[in-house]
Curated annotation (Swiss-Prot):
SMART domains: DUF167. Belongs to the UPF0235 family. PANTHER family: UPF0235 PROTEIN C15ORF40. Pfam families: DUF167. GO terms for cellular component: cytoplasm. SUPFAM superfamilies: YggU-like. Transmembrane segments: none annotated. This is UPF0235 protein APP7_1431.
Length: 97
């Protein structure tokens, strides 16, 4: 499975992510094995990293954070998310489609 996959029905983007919490800044780092590595500033405590990741992705894709679905990996660094009907696709992610 690819790190970034375009889904047709329902339309959206599925992301396989390797999350790096407690980074110095929020950013898409690049590919890490077969996953998209994303660094965020939030610590991995009490769901703070997941909440921060959803907020960061909602800003990148211009969608409500409540619409992003965390499909796998709630308590792990390896995650799978679905972003339905993104209004904008960041250039780092567009390059992987």
């Amino acid at each position: 499975m690819e790190a970034v996959e375009r889904i047709e029905n329902p339309y959206g983007i599925r992301l396989r992510i390797f999350l790096q919490p407690k980074a110095s800044r929020d950013q898409i780092v690049g590919l890490h094995d077969s996953e998209l590595k994303i660094a965020i500033t939030a610590p991995p405590v009490d769901g703070a990293a997941n909440a921060h990741l959803l907020k960061y992705l909602s800003k990148l894709f211009k969608v409500p954070k409540s619409s992003i679905v965390l499909e796998k990996g709630e308590l792990q660094r390896h995650k799978q998310l679905f972003v339905p009907e993104p209004k904008l696709i960041p250039k780092e992610i567009e390059a992987l489609l």
